[in-house]
A protein has these predicted regions:
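DUTPase catalytic domain/fold
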Residues: 1-145
């Protein structure tokens, strides 16, 4: 088992937890002192109160919790947040209220999930031509699916 080093930036912060033994993402918690209401179309930067060390060669991805998006219309404004392995600041979740109703966050509420994944960092080479494929430049429905 791997271990991620976590630093509490606030005494009320909660460390990430997994909802089940096989969960891919660990829940991130709102480190707020009182309820916060996010109006429709509004963005709120949710502090988690933690900083952590993503292993070198990996990235931490911040995804919406399915229940937050499906039931309440709250999801990360940038769709997926990327935490690089050399970042040591507080993890914050930029939530956007996509619904037409105000949504209230409670202190300690689970607001996102955090997935650690390996990353490649290839070199980019400029070329005159790319290799041929059956698909070519077809996209956005070109495969008939």
């Amino acid at each position: 088992m791997n271990t991620i080093r976590v630093k509490k930036m606030h005494p009320d912060a909660m460390l990430p937890t997994y909802g089940s033994a096989d969960a891919a993402g660990a829940d991130l918690y709102a480190c707020i002192q009182e309820p916060v209401t996010i109006q429709p179309g509004e963005v709120f930067w949710v502090p988690t109160g933690i900083a952590l060390e993503v292993p070198k060669g990996c990235a931490g991805l911040v995804y919406a919790r399915s229940s937050m998006g499906a039931k309440r219309g709250l999801a990360p404004a940038n769709k997926v947040g990327v935490v690089d392995s050399d970042y040591r600041g507080e993890i914050r979740v930029v939530l956007l209220n996509h619904s037409n109703q105000p949504q209230t966050l409670q202190p300690g509420e689970r607001v996102a999930q955090f997935v650690i994944t390996p990353v490649l960092q290839p070199m980019y080479e400029e070329v005159e031509e790319l290799s041929d494929t059956g698909r070519g430049a077809g996209g956005f429905g070109s495969t008939g699916k």
